[in-house]
Every structure is written in C-alpha cells, then in structure tokens.
Regions:
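Alpha-helical interaction elements in eukaryotic regulators
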Residues: 1-2, 11, 42, 46, ...
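Extended C-terminal regions of large enzymes
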Residues: 1-113, 120, 124, 330
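Non-catalytic C-terminal interaction segments of nucleic acid-processing enzymes
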Residues: 42, 46-51, 58-67, 150, ...
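Conserved, non-catalytic sequence blocks in retroelement Pol enzymes and Pol-derived host proteins
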Residues: 89-91, 113-118, 147-152, 261-266
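Short, flexible/disordered secondary-structure transition segments
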Residues: 111, 135-139, 169-177, 281-289
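Short Cys/His-based metal-binding microdomains
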Residues: 116-169, 250
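Short amphipathic alpha-helical segments embedded in low-complexity Lys/Glu-rich regions
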Residues: 117-118, 141-144, 176-186, 289-295
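UBC/E2-like fold recognition across ubiquitin and ubiquitin-like conjugation systems
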Residues: 145, 158-159, 163-198
Length: 369
C-alpha cells in the first residue's frame, strides 16, 4: 500500500513539474518554475501531494457523516475558529477549546446526545422543558435563555468588543483626507530583475471617505440609543450607527449571533428589517448604508463580517485581529451559556466567562538538581 501511494505521488509530482499552474494574481510567467528540482524539493512536493490527498479524504469522509460532518458546510460562508498552535497553547483554556471542538462534531454532552448514548432516558431542557434539548437549542433557541437575557448578554459582549476598535478607526480618519490609510500598490518583480518604478500610493475608498466628523452610537440592552433626530425620527435602533452631518451620510451596522447553519438566513432577515428605514433616510436627502455582522454561536465569523469592516476602510491586519477577537468572545459566551444550561439563576453565573478565558502560560521547568 505504501509503495502504491509513493508511486502515485511521484507520478503526480512529475505532472506538476511538467504542467505547472499559476497561483495568485501575479500573472503568467511571474512564478518561479523549476523544471529540474533538487532531491529535497522533490521530497517536499511529494509530501505536499500526499498531505493534500489525506486532507481531501478526511473532508470527503466528514461530509458523508450526518451529525459529525455538518461543519464542512460552514466553511463556505464563515471563517473557522482559530485552532493554530499559538492559540491552542497561549490562548483560551483547554475547557473552551474542548467545547468548541466537540461542538463542531456534535459530541457535546447535551441532553439529546446523552439520550442517544444511553445515559439518560429523556432529553428535556431544564430551563424551558423542550422535549429535545440539542446544542442548537441551548445556544440560540431556548425561550427561557432569551427572556433571561443570556443571548442579549452575549450580543452586548460582542458590541463591547467592536466599539473601541471602531472608535479608534474613526479617530484615525481625522488625520486622513481620503477616509482611511493609503493602500500600497504591489509591484511583482521576477527573480533577478529590479523594480522598474516605485510603488504608488492609492487612496483607500470606503463608506467613510470624504469626512472626518463621524459620530458613533452603540445600542446596548442597558443603554438603549435614540436614532439621531437630525437624520430621521424613528423608533428603530440599529446596533451601531455611524453618521456625518457634513456629508449627510449614515452607516448602520446590525449584529447577530446565530447558529452557523443559519448565518445566511440571519443576514437576509436583518437586511430585510432595516431596508425600509434605509429607504426613508434616503427620501429625506441622506445617503444611507446598511451592513451586517454575523458571528456564529460556536465562534465562526461570517465572511460578510470581514467585508463589512473592509468597507469601513479598516486595514486587513486589523480586520483579521478583530474577527479573531469576536470569534473568541462569542465562543466564551456560548460556553458560559452551555455551562448554565441547568441553572435558572443566570445573574450568579456570569463569572463563568472569566473562568472560560484564562490564558495559559508556558509551564516552567521546576525540576531540581
């Protein structure tokens, strides 16, 4: 079996060397194609080929599973939780990591899974009495958790993470005339050639371009906002409102934390809720923009969230850092909600959030000679 795999990998490696493909946006002929690689380079190509086959078989097998393979469908519309070695070692604690991993393959100890495994005779929800208490029910669909403010607390936690980043971004726009930091135009240079011309700086165009008097309002459950009356008198309250009187422009951002399989439906629902408000604002002479932010209950960040922050003019590095922070916050809050699935006294269990996010420090060698 090993000989067959190696021979197949060697054949595919030869095909990759004879018929190389161009990756990225560099253009044809910009890559470094080595027709006669060394033995170490051939070994790396063969290893990458075998690893690619293994990954394809793993994903194909996971997709065929009814319960454990649902996570393969989320990768098309959401960015997964950060499982890098750095985050696993120095990031959240082992309990949170175990919860996120088990939630992806539907192996969390929920009442329905305990009944399936034969540990309990029923699968009732301890809070609302639902006859089938799944992980989806605990995280996003329990009426008692909704009325008790657990989902609202998670929602406010995400808003409190976004607010300082947006404030810092708006303050940075005051020093930029074009509404954001400049973009560097990348010039691709072949090996051995010199840069023909210096890289040009192109202004970043975003929804916040052209003004520096932007104001920000964030709607919390305990601190509700009033929609700016100079724009329009309405009782609707988007989660985040950014507006400029000089440009007569407003940007509304709506946040939701649905289940990963319902991210697209949640986005369409939020857009439909505020479409009429957007039209009313445009009728009074203002320019309105409507964006959505979706973070799955297991920590998967929708790609539309990244596009939202990019449309605001944020740099890619800051967008990536913010998305990781949002993913971790939602995962911590969902873990706290899961731990309190049997406790109706929610106010006394909010300290679970701190226990779920204690960063682990490197273990010091305490051996004595």
């Amino acid at each position: 079996q090993i000989i067959k795999v190696l021979s197949a990998a060697e054949s595919e490696t030869k095909l990759r060397l004879l018929f190389p493909t161009q990756d990225g946006r560099a253009g044809l002929g910009a890559g470094n194609f080595n027709a006669s690689p060394t033995s170490s380079e051939q070994r790396e190509l063969m290893v990458s080929t075998v690893v690619g086959w293994s990954d394809e078989e793993h994903i194909a097998h996971a997709s065929s599973l009814a319960l454990q393979g649902t996570w393969t469908k989320w990768s098309e519309q959401a960015r997964p939780f950060d499982f890098s070695w750095k985050n696993l070692i120095y990031g959240p604690g082992p309990h949170l990591i175990r919860f996120v991993l088990n939630s992806l393959i539907n192996c969390v100890k929920t009442p329905d899974m305990l009944q399936l495994w034969g540990y309990t005779p029923t699968a009732f929800c301890s809070l609302c009495g639902n006859d089938k208490c799944t992980l989806h029910h605990i995280l996003v669909n329990c009426n008692c958790a909704l009325v008790g403010g657990r989902y609202t607390w998670r929602h406010d936690s995400v808003l409190s993470t976004m607010e300082p980043v947006l404030k810092a971004h708006l303050s940075s726009l005051k020093n930029e005339k074009d509404g954001g930091p400049p973009l560097i135009e990348k010039s691709f240079v072949r090996k051995g050639d010199n840069l023909a011309r210096p890289a040009k700086l192109a202004p970043r165009k975003s929804l916040l371009s052209g003004s520096t008097d932007w104001k920000l309002l964030v709607d919390y459950s305990d601190r509700p906002i009033v929609f700016p009356p100079e724009i329009l008198a309405t009782s609707q309250r988007p989660d985040i409102v950014i507006w400029s009187i000089a440009l007569k422009k407003v940007v509304m951002i709506e946040l939701t934390c649905p289940a990963e399989e319902g991210i697209e439906a949640a986005r369409e629902r939020k857009l439909g809720r505020y479409t009429q408000l957007k039209q009313d604002i445009e009728e009074v002479g203002w320019t309105a923009g409507l964006l959505t932010v979706e973070v799955g209950a297991r920590g998967y960040v929708a790609y539309s969230t990244e596009r939202c922050f990019r449309q605001l003019g944020m740099q890619k590095r800051k967008v990536s850092s913010l998305c990781k922070s949002l993913s971790r916050v939602v995962a911590r809050c969902s873990y706290a909600i899961y731990l309190s699935r049997k406790n109706k006294d929610w106010d006394k269990n909010r300290e679970l959030l701190a226990d779920a996010d204690v960063p682990r420090q490197p273990v010091q060698d305490q051996t004595t000679t």
